[in-house]
A protein has these predicted regions:
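N-terminal accessory targeting/assembly segments
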Residues: 1-185, 189-194, 205
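Long, charge-dense accessory insertions within large macromolecular proteins
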Residues: 164-220, 290-291, 297, 316-320, ...
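N-terminal pre-Walker A segment at the start of P-loop NTPase domains
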Residues: 206-241, 276, 284-289, 293-300, ...
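Glycine-rich phosphate-binding P-loop
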Residues: 240-272
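Flexible beta-alpha connector loops of hexameric P-loop NTPases
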Residues: 298, 308-329, 360-376
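Phosphate-binding/switch loop-helix module in NTP-utilizing enzymes
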Residues: 320-354
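Conserved P-loop NTPase nucleotide-binding/switch module
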Residues: 340-383, 387-388, 397-428
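Conserved NTP phosphate-binding and transfer environment spanning the P-loop NTPase/kinase superfamily
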Residues: 388-391, 397-576
Length: 576
């Protein structure tokens, strides 16, 4: 490994040369307090910035044992350090001058949720930060003096005040770690208390706006109905009270604009931990919860939707259903079956975004269209089977059909943003207004042995990133382009993820794209099932984190860990 003085000498030797001379800087350099690695150098000042990495020895960083003791605490610590580092480099970005992206210093900007990210990793041995730097130029001529400012003046100060415990706010570090431990304690107690979700008293559920996930100011704080109030004993905060939603079928009702969907949205994002001050720190949902909706036009491949749809007029086999252009009802049926395969124990649905004919059939419609002419068994007739025979609970927001009262174990009415337990009232009314129930065919767990296939359209030969020579005996390379949280292009096709409402960060999408790319290039062989491929990927993630997704030995700083449910959802939308 070279020294920082070697880097300074090289910089001065290439000053005023043509921009490609910057590539001679690739490598690692020992600074006094850390190792600086230049992993990738941009082709010109207008291209995507260069990839740079800083590695700090964990002993030198000297974080206390309570913050380093397990994966959970290290994730919370990494999140806090990354936010601090982002704030530090924000003071220096574009202070170095030049053309194009010259002087840019950027790193992942975290949202309200705490995610495992490659931008900052903490383990027992070291702390690693990955970020981007726009190497300065005048036109396309190297301006090494400006890069020297970044690497020898600005960056050392950012590292000093971001990754060394003695220079940080000890209270903030402790608070972040203790919050993570308290949040995990709630997750553990959900199972112990027979709950699928918990919403703490005084939680703030509404968000600032449709484009901001910050808490709304002057909003109505959440208050649990007494009949649903439970107490969580937390290791640091002690007793915390709030509304516990029990296993089974829960119905959320209420007038328009009274907070039904706001509560459901908070619950669907309760699969993630939130930062202090978010208002949803203790809105905690079963981590396998899956938000479902209809998706007209989605791709479905070999899914057993027979528990919901049978005897199609075209004679199509619904035990192995495939389509390039699903209807609202078939897409939602497939989503439920795929969610079961992904191990979800809780389904979240909103009547507003569901296919009406999939959810319910009223008595009048049953009279007009007899059951033998209707291939769809509505969700209303299957929700109880899903819970009693498959152990899957449901939380459903409804605003138009009263039929759902008849299957609900718990009914919560949102009244001016406050929840009211009206279960007893609803059950009494059900006796006064009975409904005609269709007798569905016997429930059977769906068949699930779907082989994963691959599409090599758009694949290119792998080349050595230094010489450009084709690499022999290596799998072809699929090009990948991420489009925010909407999806990604892989090869010549697009994977549409717009309706995965629990996919919250573009870096999760980027990671999903890389996971699919890795699977297609290394795991998919025409024999493995989707489940087997996901299990193998999960083993890799558990063993080495997202580092195994490195390309040309370079780990991107732009990945965030998705849940296994989103992995399944992504792979199920891969059109092959």
């Amino acid at each position: 490994m070279q020294s920082d003085s070697n880097l300074r000498e090289t910089l001065r030797s290439i000053d005023h040369k043509s921009y490609p001379a910057y590539k001679s800087l690739r490598g690692s350099y020992r600074f006094a307090d850390y190792v600086l690695s230049i992993d990738h150098v941009q082709g010109d000042p207008f291209a995507a910035p260069s990839h740079v990495r800083v590695t700090v020895d964990a002993k030198a960083a000297a974080f206390p044992e309570y913050a380093m003791k397990n994966t959970r605490t290290r994730t919370a610590l990494a999140d806090e350090l990354l936010r601090t580092f982002a704030a530090q480099i924000n003071h220096f970005t574009f202070k170095a001058k030049g053309s194009g992206k010259s002087g840019l210093i950027s790193v992942t900007h975290c949202g309200q949720e705490i995610l495992t990210r490659t931008a900052c990793e903490v383990n027992e041995k070291e702390i690693t930060a990955r970020f981007a730097v726009g190497f300065p130029a005048n036109g396309r001529t190297i301006n090494a003096r400006e890069l020297e400012k970044i690497l020898f003046t600005y960056l050392p100060e950012c590292v000093k005040y971001s990754f060394y415990y003695k220079n940080l706010d000890a209270r903030r570090i402790r608070d972040a770690v203790e919050l993570a431990e308290d949040q995990q304690a709630v997750r553990d107690q959900l199972k112990e208390q027979g709950l699928v979700a918990f919403v703490a008293d005084d939680a703030v559920l509404p968000r600032e706006s449709g484009i901001s996930s910050r808490p709304m100011k002057q909003s109505v704080a959440f208050t649990s109905p007494e009949s649903l109030r439970v107490t969580m004993q937390l290791p640091h905060r002690g007793a915390v009270t709030g509304m516990g939603i029990p296993k089974g079928i829960t119905l959320i009702v209420g007038g328009g604009y009274h907070g039904k969907s706001t509560l459901l949205t908070a619950l669907e994002l309760g699969v993630y931990n939130h930062i202090a001050g978010d208002g949803r720190e203790f809105v905690i949902t079963d981590e396998t919860a899956l938000k479902l909706r209809s998706e007209d036009g989605r791709f479905i491949k070999d899914v057993d939707i027979s528990m919901f749809i049978n005897d199609l007029p075209n004679g199509k086999d619904t035990h192995h259903f495939s389509t390039e252009d699903a209807s609202g009802s078939t897409s939602q049926a497939a989503g439920i079956v795929e969610g079961m395969e992904a191990g979800s124990r809780l389904f979240l649905l909103d009547e507003d975004t569901s296919a009406t004919n999939f959810m319910v059939r009223d008595a009048f419609m049953q009279k007009v269209v007899s059951p033998d002419k209707e291939p769809i068994t509505p969700f209303l007739s299957r929700a109880r089977d899903l819970y009693e025979q498959a152990g899957i609970s449901t939380i459903l927001v409804a605003g138009s059909s009263g039929a759902f009262f008849h299957i609900a174990d718990t009914v919560i009415q949102m009244d001016r943003y406050k929840p009211v337990d009206i279960t007893k009232k609803a059950k009494a009314l059900c006796k006064e207004f009975p409904i005609s129930e269709e007798k569905p065919h016997p429930f059977a767990l769906p068949h699930s042995h779907r082989i994963m296939e691959k599409d090599k359209n758009g694949a290119t030969k792998r080349r050595d990133y230094r010489s450009g020579a084709v690499r022999k005996n290596e799998p072809e390379r699929l090009k990948l382009k991420t489009m925010g949280t909407d999806g990604f292009a892989i090869g010549k096709q697009t994977v549409d993820l717009r309706y995965l409402e629990q996919l919250i960060d573009s870096e999760q999408t980027a990671c999903l794209g890389m996971l699919l790319k890795y699977a297609v290039e290394h795991l998919v062989d025409g024999k493995r099932t989707i489940a087997e491929v996901v299990v193998q990927l999960q083993k890799e993630l558990d063993t080495s984190g997202m580092r195994f997704l490195a390309e040309n030995g370079i780990v991107s700083g732009g990945y965030a860990m998705p849940r296994v449910q989103e992995m399944y959802s992504c792979f199920n939308r891969y059109r092959v």
